[in-house]
From Swiss-Prot:
Keyword field contains Ribosomal protein: no
Its biological purpose: Activates the tRNA-splicing ligase complex by facilitating the enzymatic turnover of catalytic subunit RtcB. Acts by promoting the guanylylation of RtcB, a key intermediate step in tRNA ligation. Can also alter the NTP specificity of RtcB such that ATP, dGTP or ITP is used efficiently.
Residues the entry annotates as binding Ca(2+): D12, D138, I139
GO biological process: tRNA splicing, via endonucleolytic cleavage and ligation
Organism: Saccharolobus islandicus (strain Y.N.15.51 / Yellowstone #2)
Pfam families: Archease (PF01951)
GO molecular function list: calcium ion binding
Keyword terms: Calcium, Metal-binding, tRNA processing
Protein name: Protein archease
InterPro entries: Archease (IPR002804), Archease_arc (IPR022952), Archease_dom (IPR023572), Archease_dom_sf (IPR036820)
Coiled coil: none
Source organism, top-level taxon: Archaea
Family from the record: Belongs to the archease family.
UniProt entry tagged with the keyword Transit peptide: no
Length: 139
């Protein structure tokens, strides 16, 4: 199973992420976002940021997850390539770590800046054998 794919969207970028678990799908969604920014295969997981979030539904939790990661990129130039997280659907909370390093133009390719997460086309579906997350980011 592929982890994510991009789809065309006027002036923005659509991402479809997959995972056997909800946590894996959220991780792959984040990886897709950072793949827009740089080549994540060159991002070493040497630092982490702890993340604690709550939402009112899964879509809101995903929105906050991506926005929180983009906050670290905007404020600290952190790029991420590895994610360890737990989602509690009863309390609608996400707890985890995002692993990566500070962007370095000598090591990391500068691609496209992701400005923000959006609710446009945002959906989280559970199929027979995986979760599928679809969303659009503003570039």
């Amino acid at each position: 199973m592929r982890s994510f794919e991009f789809f065309e969207h006027t002036a923005d970028v659509g991402i479809r992420a997959y995972g056997k678990s909800l946590e894996e799908a959220f991780s792959n969604a984040a990886l897709g976002v950072f793949e827009i920014i740089t080549d994540t295969s060159k991002v070493k997981p040497i630092e982490y940021r702890e993340i604690y979030l709550n939402g009112y539904d899964l879509e809101n939790l995903l929105y906050k997850w991506i926005e929180e990661l983009l906050y670290y990129y905007d404020s600290e130039l952190m790029v991420f390539s590895k994610f360890d997280l737990m989602i509690d659907q009863d309390s609608m909370t996400l707890e985890g770590k995002a692993w990566g390093e500070k962007f370095n133009g000598k090591i990391h390719e500068r691609r496209t800046v992701v400005k923000a997460m959006t609710y446009h086309q945002l959906s989280i579906e559970k199929t027979e054998n995986c979760y599928v997350i679809t969303f659009v980011v503003d570039i």
